[in-house]
Design a protein with these regions (language model features):
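Short glycine-rich phosphate-binding loop at a beta-alpha junction
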Residues: 51-58
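Conserved acidic residues
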Residues: 52, 118, 148
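Short, glycine/charge-rich flexible loops or terminal/linker lids adjacent to PRPP-binding catalytic cores
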Residues: 74-120, 186-188
């Protein structure tokens, strides 16, 4: 998506350790008109899929997923990284390692909100090594739902998570794929 690539070049900041900061428009402060364009693009890409649920993981994916869901006119459900007192009933659970936070999370999702009747589109802001997506895919499989595919805003192609998932037959649609990053530049695929 050319608009996204231009925005990354204009406002993104490359940090040591293969970190790309896009917090001014994507995952801390959210530029709603811009994210609307992302939502329209995912709707265009998945127009042929019978999506009934958008799935993401807290926290950065939630805002994007909500905008995308408006174009499909379906609910968003998000996996939580922590148990809370207001969660009850049966849960799907998995462990997910975060590249950015260097932590392993126990991720949970209520069985009330995802089942065999669902056709799921997973939405997330970043794809690096694929751990978060693999965990969400495991939850979808455990629910008996159909995974229609994944929608990623920015994929770090040099970390090969997307390549690995595609090799497994998962439909991965990324709006911008970065093939290389140095401390002062990046290259798109």
């Amino acid at each position: 998506m050319q608009l996204l690539k231009e925005r990354i070049l204009k406002d993104g900041i490359v940090k040591p350790g293969n970190i790309l900061k896009v917090d001014s428009f994507l995952n801390h402060q959210i530029d709603i008109p811009f994210i609307n364009e992302i939502g329209k693009e995912f709707k265009r890409i998945y127009a042929d899929a019978p999506i009934t649920k958008i799935l993401t993981i807290e926290a950065s994916g939630i805002g994007i997923a909500c905008i995308v869901a408006q174009y499909f006119n379906v609910p968003v459900v998000f996996a939580k990284k922590a148990q809370s007192l207001n969660l009850d009933g049966e849960m799907y659970s998995t462990k997910i390692e975060s590249f950015t936070h260097k932590k392993v999370y126990d991720v949970i999702l209520s069985k009330k909100f995802l089942g065999p009747e669902d056709h799921v589109l997973i939405i997330d802001d970043f794809l690096a090594n694929g751990c978060a997506l693999k965990g969400l895919i495991e939850i979808v499989k455990n629910s008996g739902a159909v995974l229609e595919g994944t929608g990623i805003v920015i994929e770090k192609g040099f970390q090969h998570g997307g390549d690995m998932l595609r090799e497994e037959g998962i439909r991965v649609e990324s709006l911008a794929i970065i093939d290389s990053m140095t401390d002062d530049s990046l290259t798109f695929r």
